[in-house]
Structures are given as C-alpha cells and as structure tokens.
Amino acid sequence: MRHFLDFEKPVAELEAKIEELRRMTDPGELNIAEEVTLLSDKAERQLRTLYGRLSPWQKTQVARHPERPKARDVIAGLITEFTPLAGDRGFGEDAAIVAGPGRFKGEPVMVIAIEKGWDLESRLKHNFGSPRPEGYRKARRLIEMAGRFGLPVLSFVDTSGAYPGVDAEARGQAEAIARGIDACLAAPVPFIATIIGEGGSGGAIAIAAADTVLMFEHAIYSVISPEGCAAILWEDRANAAQAAEAMKITAQDLKRLGIIDRIVPEPLGGAHRDPQAAITALGAAIAETLPGLAALAPEALRAKRREKFLAIGQTLPV
C-alpha cells in the first residue's frame, strides 16, 4: 500500500477511488475502464500541480519519504561487482557508511554511500543513516585508496547528520569529519557526489566535497535540519516550515546559489513513485559528467575542487 504525505491527500483520495473501481467484479452499467481513465488523468493533473509548487518543507517531507530509493537501491541500480569493505583500521566498523570498489558502466570506481535503512532492523543496523567517527574514517581510508589506484569516486549522500552521541564525540567526531573533507579535497581522481535524499550538515559534506555535486530534484541539503534550526532560533520545532523556507535547502535554491552543480530530475510525484526511473536519470547524469573530469590531470582536479569550495559565498550579499 502506497504511503501518502499529508499534502498529497487529494491524490490519495483519487487513487483510492481508482483502486476501488478496479476491484469491482460486477461493473453493471458502469463503464469502468472509461471512469478509471478519467480519474487517472485527474490524479496525474493533481499530482503535477502539487509537485510543481512544493514548499521547502514539503520537499523535506518528500526527501524523507519512507519509500524513497536508498543508497542500497542506487548502488544496486548503477554499480556492478560492488564489493563492500569494512572497518577504519583503528576502532571498528560503522554500517551507516557503505563503501567499496565496483564498476560503473564497466569502468572501475570507488563508491562511498550513507545508508539510512529501509525497515526497522536495517535502520537500527545502519544507525538511521547517522555515521559515527569510524564510518567517516572508513570513508577517508577508501577515498585515499581510490587515489592510489586511480579510481574515480562516486558518493551518495542521504543523512540527517552525523551521529551526535557522547561516544561519537569522545572518539573524535569533529576531527573525523574534518579529515574526511580534507581527503575529499585532496583526492587526485574525479569525484562526483550526489545528494539523493537528505544532506545534513558536516555529516553530509564529509563525503561530498566533490568536483561535481549532483542533487535529486526533491532532495534537501542544509547545515542543520529544519526542526533543529527552528528549535535554536524560535525555541520551538513547530516552526520547522518557516526554518526550511529561510535556510534555502532545496535543489533549486542551491543551484541558484552555486552550492550544487546540477539537478537530477525525478519522476512525477517524486523518486519514491518510480525509483528505477530516478536511478536511471542519475546514472545518465553521472555518465555525462565523468568523462570531462577524467580528462583533467590530478593537480588540475585538486586545484579546481579547492577553488570551487573556497569561492562559495564570496559573491553573495551579506
């Protein structure tokens, strides 16, 4: 059964009526096929209208949709011969970061991804997509490995933020994130990052300081969650919608501000309605971007990458 968001109620009612008609075994005088077609067209128009004017808070809900494709789906759809590697060679393993070598369209790459999980058991295993220090150190280790072996890096980001627990802080969470960003900037190979759902704070940028940052049409990318921002500025998480509007967290705003480089279109109604179509569109965007980066020398890649991130915000009005 499809999960509908609050603002999708008109579409939910239409689709429920369509399903009811399709289940009818004795249509009587009703022309079921014609009625279903009319209602389907109406539902599509309603969906197009709704998704053509989503607010930042509504986009946040879409980015968090439980049926939205996760990192495992993207990897399964785009990467062959994927071999996940474990451990930071210092403390332990963190399943929130799923990473290892594989092939993209037949060519070897290094994949770094943050996995939220898709049911209760997997969400607990992957810590709801909030990496600990050992996860970021594993990512750094594999980015450095990619540099040694000349493998382009593809990262897929979906996290509300790094794990903020006391144990993570005790093991150097801030240092792990900072060194992760440094490893991204220093990588002598092409690096493409994609925000596939949520991109939350330093926990996201630790694997997203890339040559090219792609972002799904209804994903979000911000320094803090809207609820967290509202709790700080208004001391009330109920102001999350207002915070989302103020923070400019949508792909459209971030493209305009120069934070991301390209928006990957989603199927009508969001990636959760047709995950395979969304993943195919992402694969096409990566395939179009990678050759241009692969043509650059390592020093040119590093220089352009650093220049890109140092330039962010310099031309914005204060």
Swiss-Prot record:
Q: Give the EC number.
A: 2.1.3.15
| Keyword vocabulary terms for this entry | ATP-binding, Cytoplasm, Fatty acid biosynthesis, Fatty acid metabolism, Lipid biosynthesis, Lipid metabolism, Nucleotide-binding, Transferase
InterPro entries linked: Acetyl_CoA_COase_a_su, ClpP/crotonase-like_dom_sf, COA_CT_C
Q: Which reaction does it catalyse?
A: N(6)-carboxybiotinyl-L-lysyl-[protein] + acetyl-CoA = N(6)-biotinyl-L-lysyl-[protein] + malonyl-CoA
Could you tell me the superkingdom of the organism this chain comes from?
Answer: Bacteria
A molecular function (GO) held by this record is: acetyl-CoA carboxylase activity
User: Where in the cell is the protein located?
Assistant: Cytoplasm
Q: What class of enzyme is it?
A: transferase
Q: Which Pfam families match?
A: ACCA (PF03255)
Q: Where are the transmembrane segments?
A: none
Gene Ontology terms: biological process: fatty acid biosynthetic process; malonyl-CoA biosynthetic process
Q: Which PANTHER family would you find in this protein's record?
A: ACETYL-COENZYME A CARBOXYLASE CARBOXYL TRANSFERASE SUBUNIT ALPHA, ACETYL-COENZYME A CARBOXYLASE CARBOXYL TRANSFERASE SUBUNIT ALPHA, CHLOROPLASTIC
Q: What does this protein do?
A: Component of the acetyl coenzyme A carboxylase (ACC) complex. First, biotin carboxylase catalyzes the carboxylation of biotin on its carrier protein (BCCP) and then the CO(2) group is transferred by the carboxyltransferase to acetyl-CoA to form malonyl-CoA.
Q: Which family does it belong to?
A: Belongs to the AccA family.
Question: How does it associate, per the subunit comment?
Answer: Acetyl-CoA carboxylase is a heterohexamer composed of biotin carboxyl carrier protein (AccB), biotin carboxylase (AccC) and two subunits each of ACCase subunit alpha (AccA) and ACCase subunit beta (AccD).
Write the protein's name: Acetyl-coenzyme A carboxylase carboxyl transferase subunit alpha
Q: Which organism is it from?
A: Acidiphilium cryptum (strain JF-5)
